[in-house]
């Protein structure tokens, strides 16, 4: 991956959240784009990575949805006077990346106990599920951005997606009164430019550019009795003979050379 594509991929994380499709729509679109490559057993980079993220997102999404459903069902058995665990006592995504997966439950339990030692067991389970679901959602957000990048590179080409991300970020960072009303689209960027053809016929060959070299002055010539004479040369004095009469021969021309025959 060249430096421009690498920079564009990093900039994907800065795009607004509502720019990307919802998880269900994203996975469906990605599968449609990947299906021809799956049938041909392609091992292209974008195919392999996009396939990995499709599987990852589907598993994480189903698990996260299950966590939310169980957490909501526990609300009915939590004592009504129980205060929710503040956000500061819940493990965040950045912290979870530094904690081994097997120790995640222990770290979260210690934080709940530090908030309230006798916290009800049902409320503790609810707090754990909410914390893990939040971590999964942030991981899903990163994964869906990467999935969007890789399957769009298959659809439009990596260079076009790189160009599109650059233009879109420029549009987003430009004040509203100085930019166009609509954001750029990748369809418009990849559409071939059509030049309107006029009614004038053009030659198929290459046209010589004008104005680069001075024009050469054409030298007019006239034919005088079978000989070409340039008008740019110095003219001889006019002959007294009338036009069309033979030129008088010089005196030397009257002397004939001796003939080889006797």
From Swiss-Prot:
GO molecular function per UniProt: DNA binding; RNA binding; structural molecule activity
SUPFAM superfamilies reported in the protein's UniProt record: Hepatitis B viral capsid (hbcag) (SSF47852)
Gene Ontology biological process terms from the UniProt entry: microtubule-dependent intracellular transport of viral material towards nucleus; symbiont entry into host cell; viral penetration into host nucleus
The keyword DNA-binding is annotated on this UniProt entry: yes
Region (Disordered): 183-262
GO cellular component, one term: T=4 icosahedral viral capsid
Pfam family, one: Hepatitis_core
Compositionally skewed regions (Basic residues) per UniProt: 215-234, 252-262
Protein name stated in the entry: Capsid protein
Lineage: Viruses, Riboviria, Pararnavirae, Artverviricota, Revtraviricetes
Encoding gene (name): C
């Amino acid at each position: 991956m060249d430096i421009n594509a690498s920079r564009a991929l990093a900039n994907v994380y800065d795009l607004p959240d509502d720019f990307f499709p919802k998880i269900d729509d994203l996975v469906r679109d990605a599968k449609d784009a990947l299906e021809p490559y799956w049938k041909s057993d392609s091992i292209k980079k974008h195919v392999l990575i996009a396939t990995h993220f499709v599987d990852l997102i589907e598993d994480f999404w189903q698990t996260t949805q299950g966590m939310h459903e169980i957490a909501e069902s526990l609300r009915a058995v939590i004592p009504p006077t129980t205060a929710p665990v503040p956000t500061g006592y819940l493990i965040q995504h950045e912290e979870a990346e530094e904690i081994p997966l097997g120790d995640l439950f222990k770290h979260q339990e210690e934080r709940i106990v530090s908030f309230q030692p006798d916290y009800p067991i049902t409320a503790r389970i609810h707090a754990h599920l909410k914390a893990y679901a939040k971590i999964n959602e942030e991981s899903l957000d990163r994964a869906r951005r990467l999935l969007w990048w890789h399957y769009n590179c298959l659809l439009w080409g990596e260079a076009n997606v790189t160009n599109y991300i650059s233009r879109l970020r420029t549009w987003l960072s430009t004040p509203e009164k100085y930019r166009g009303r609509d954001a750029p689209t990748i369809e418009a960027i990849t559409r071939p430019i059509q030049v309107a053809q006029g009614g004038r016929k053009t030659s198929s060959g290459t046209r010589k550019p004008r104005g680069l070299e001075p024009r050469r002055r054409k030298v007019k010539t006239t034919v005088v009795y079978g000989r070409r004479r340039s008008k740019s040369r110095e003219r001889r004095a006019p002959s007294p003979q009338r036009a069309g009469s033979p030129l008088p021969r010089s005196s030397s021309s009257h002397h004939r050379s001796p003939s080889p025959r006797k």
